[in-house]
């Protein structure tokens, strides 16, 4: 019982700082507060009543259905533990449209997460059906990979290492704007959308969708 209370106290005071320093709050909790990562997952992510929060999105499902699978493969890459990711995909009725999931291994003290290059290297290797090794990680070519993510830090990280397209899904933006190119504070280029359907209009992405006019 004390550990659960401790998690709550730490989350209230330290979560933001851990996220900023480590890219993911749980890494700071593991390294500095001896939190059991699987206990954290059980009492935090798995305890969230997602069935009451999430529901299938027909527009999102149609967007994924409209991707030409002879031109593009769809993977989910997440900083969550795999059980949480699979649970979300099932609730959203998207499991059958996702070819694979790359997640964080909470059982590994030194696990990588977005936006670290090592995480993206492993994601590329796994999407190509390769077991990550020193050789194929170093040879990872990001130019044929496209990423859309709702966390700007992840998009900037992907753009810096050469992803073919890095798109920030700014769902909370007050501006009603279409897809557009922009730059981060340090000058890193990326694209921003305020609705996922706007991916259809981006130069690189639109070639991945089925042409319904023919």
Stretches found by the model and what they are:
Residues 1-58, 62, 69, 83:
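N-terminal helical cap/lid subdomain that shapes the substrate entry/recognition surface
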Residues 51-55, 76, 111-115:
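Short, surface-exposed alpha-helical recognition segments that flank or form part
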Residues 65-68, 82-214:
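Asp-based, Mg2+/Mn2+-dependent phosphohydrolase catalytic module
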Residues 78-80:
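Conserved phosphate-coupling serine/threonine residues in phosphotransfer and NTP-handling enzymes
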């Amino acid at each position: 019982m004390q550990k659960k209370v401790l998690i709550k106290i730490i989350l209230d005071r330290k979560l933001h700082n851990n996220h900023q320093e480590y890219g993911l709050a749980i890494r700071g909790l593991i390294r500095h507060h001896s939190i059991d990562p699987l206990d954290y997952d059980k009492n935090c992510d798995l305890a969230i009543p997602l069935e009451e929060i999430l529901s299938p999105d027909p527009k999102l499902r149609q967007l994924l259905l409209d991707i030409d699978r002879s031109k593009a493969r769809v993977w989910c890459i997440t900083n969550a533990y795999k059980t949480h990711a699979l649970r979300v995909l099932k609730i959203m009725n998207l499991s059958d449209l996702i070819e694979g999931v790359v997640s964080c291994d909470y059982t590994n003290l030194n696990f990588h997460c977005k936006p670290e290059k090592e995480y993206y290297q492993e994601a590329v290797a796994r999407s190509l059906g390769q077991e990550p090794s020193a050789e194929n990680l170093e040879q990872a070519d990001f130019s044929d990979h496209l990423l859309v993510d709702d966390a700007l830090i992840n998009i900037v990280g992907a753009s810096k290492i050469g992803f073919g397209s890095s798109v920030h899904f700014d769902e909370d933006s007050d501006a009603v704007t279409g897809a557009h190119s922009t730059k981060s504070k340090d000058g890193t280029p990326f694209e921003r959308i305020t609705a996922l359907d706007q991916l259809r209009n981006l130069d690189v992405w639109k070639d991945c969708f089925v042409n319904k006019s023919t």
